Amino acid sequence: MSASGLPFDDFRELLRNLPGPDAAALVAARERDAQLTKPPGALGRLEEIAFWLAAWTGKAPVVNRPLVAIFAGNHGVTRQGVTPFPSSVTAQMVENFAAGGAAINQICVSHDLGLKVFDLALEYPTGDITEEAALSERDCAATMAFGMEAIAGGTDLLCIGEMGIGNTTIAAAINLGLYGGTAEEWVGPGTGSEGEVLKRKIAAVEKAVALHRDHLSDPLELMRRLGGREIAAMAGAILAARVQKVPVIIDGYVATAAASILKAANPSALDHCLIGHVSGEPGHLRAIEKLGKTPLLALGMRLGEGTGAALAAGIVKAAAACHSGMATFAQAGVSNKE
């Protein structure tokens, strides 16, 4: 906690003083790219990704220790009947991750990615956002701090993912609170909500945002009122990565909602981040556009678990490999353009 005694103060200070990109590393990467055995721009976004890696790591583009971090939380709003699955599924899926049986496990193995799963007090769901704040400021700040530990073991590329029954309801509420519009524009099926369940989900988002409307101009206050533990932890992880010069790939609709809170607090807060994919959740593309980002993949996925970010990590690894491993014109004895 800060000297002032307010739990969010340290995070506000951090958001005001975010480190920027490394200009010298970016120049060096561009100079090397100009000498590689290919026409300028021929690798398209792979070149942009290599430059992004250099700028935010401060060194030549390389990915040696990529990590997928999944944050799991439960939500009191599920009491409103917003999802066909019980909250117990969150803990069951955490066990599935540990046993290696989930989709993210297979993607991590196939792409040689590390995996960490963070269980965020699953036995204590957050407050029902249609009736009260999800978290106190103290609890929200503590969970952000816990999320910052995601990179403690060392990583050079962080993929942000989540698991939590009810958290697409939370994401929709965050987006409605941040950007306005209607609940229908931001609410999607999530884990399969349709019919009356979908109607209850829309109603819950409307009610939650109306209840907290007078307190949503402050992004961190919005997060504690409408968010959840995995939202706070993902925000903390993204901030820690910025400070430690670790580039980030953000996963789907829920992870993007967490990132959007940081962007609202500081317009440059996500400059070290890529969006891994656009999900099948209807509001995700709209949320990405609000961030001014372009997703790497569009596969119609809407699973969460960091799966889209993990698949995108394969592209980022390939970009780094091309930049570092390709021969220059001089090395290969290939004539450059005159």
UniProtKB/Swiss-Prot annotation:
CDD domains, A to Z: DMB-PRT_CobT (cd02439)
SUPFAM superfamilies, per database record: Nicotinate mononucleotide:5,6-dimethylbenzimidazole phosphoribosyltransferase (CobT)
Gene Ontology molecular function: any one: nicotinate-nucleotide-dimethylbenzimidazole phosphoribosyltransferase activity
An example Gene Ontology biological process: cobalamin biosynthetic process
Enzyme class name: transferase
InterPro entries: Nict_dMeBzImd_PRibTrfase (IPR003200), Nict_dMeBzImd_PRibTrfase_bact (IPR017846), Nict_dMeBzImd_PRibTrfase_N (IPR023195), Nict_dMeBzImd_PRibTrfase_sf (IPR036087)
Pathway(s) this gene product operates in, as recorded in its UniProt entry: Nucleoside biosynthesis; alpha-ribazole biosynthesis; alpha-ribazole from 5,6-dimethylbenzimidazole: step 1/2
One Pfam family from the record: DBI_PRT
This enzyme's EC code(s): 2.4.2.21
Catalytic center residues: 305 (proton acceptor)
Reactions catalysed according to its record: 5,6-dimethylbenzimidazole + nicotinate beta-D-ribonucleotide = alpha-ribazole 5'-phosphate + nicotinate + H(+)
Family: Belongs to the CobT family.
Assembly and binders: Homodimer.
PANTHER family recorded: NICOTINATE-NUCLEOTIDE--DIMETHYLBENZIMIDAZOLE PHOSPHORIBOSYLTRANSFERASE
Function statement: Catalyzes the synthesis of alpha-ribazole-5'-phosphate from nicotinate mononucleotide (NAMN) and 5,6-dimethylbenzimidazole (DMB).
Protein name: Nicotinate-nucleotide--dimethylbenzimidazole phosphoribosyltransferase
Organism, as annotated: Sinorhizobium sp
Upper classification of the organism: Bacteria, Pseudomonadati, Pseudomonadota, Alphaproteobacteria, Hyphomicrobiales
Gene responsible for this protein: cobU
